[in-house]
Amino acid sequence: MYYGFDMGGTKIELGVFDENLQRIWHKRVPTPREDYPQLLQILRDLTEEADTYCGVQGSVGIGIPGLPNADDGTVFTANVPSAMGQPLQADLSRLIQREVRIDNDANCFALSEAWDPEFRTYPTVLGLILGTGVGGGLIVNGSIVSGRNHITGEFGHFRLPVDALDILGADIPRVPCGCGHRGCIENYISGRGFEWMYSHFYQHTLPATDIIAHYAAGEPKAVAHVERFMDVLAVCLGNLLTMLGSPFGRGGWGVV
């Protein structure tokens, strides 16, 4: 059995897959954002619950919204502060008594799509995740291209392009990013960016679900906001496709 964890800034989801890669069980729980021991306990509890369900110990892999450090085994997870700088792989492996593999979540997503029978004929596949942050994975000839420091494909940390500034206004604040820089596109085209831009333009805070509900009802501010957001998203993604020349792109969405 294969246990695949999707660890995001908002939720952790475990999917259990059989030898035919069919999902047979899954469970979702909130992500503890500040408490590392609690995070480890949740991962351990989910693993043991899956073991009980399957009657065997499955292989464990975790997709994280960040980067594993190849030098010291720690992880860089700006959107999950509880795991930031922690030796997650070694600690969890010790707790559940088996090997644990960790990679960037967008790399995992892109690789799974690239190996789908429908897409195996494509030499290059670009996978993008829009959720709490923005992640990316680049697959060439069936293999992840991650680079020496695992930063290849971290498209969310590109800066806002000029065309996006034309849409948003040259005076749009360069939002501080968890990576330490300002103006990274993940702070504008992610779920939290979607909410932040609404509050910036209308001086009123609403959750994304309410904004979308207002948009569906034809409320003018919400309609203008969603259209502005989609224009910025199109500019950012268009630049990526131009740079990579990728014949196939796949998106994973969790903005609302």
Swiss-Prot record:
Keyword flag Kinase: yes
Keywords: ATP-binding, Carbohydrate metabolism, Kinase, Metal-binding, Nucleotide-binding, Transferase, Zinc
Assigned EC number: 2.7.1.59
Positions annotated to bind Zn(2+): 157, 177, 179, 184
Molecular functions (GO terms): ATP binding; metal ion binding; N-acetylglucosamine kinase activity
Amino acids binding ATP: 4-11, 133-140
Recorded catalytic activity of this chain's protein: N-acetyl-D-glucosamine + ATP = N-acetyl-D-glucosamine 6-phosphate + ADP + H(+)
Keyword Kinase: yes
Alphabetical list of Gene3D superfamilies matching this protein: 3.30.420.40
Family the entry assigns: Belongs to the ROK (NagC/XylR) family. NagK subfamily.
Protein name, per record: N-acetyl-D-glucosamine kinase
Organism of provenance: Yersinia pestis
Taxonomy of the source species: Bacteria, Pseudomonadati, Pseudomonadota, Gammaproteobacteria, Enterobacterales
Recorded name of the encoding gene: nagK
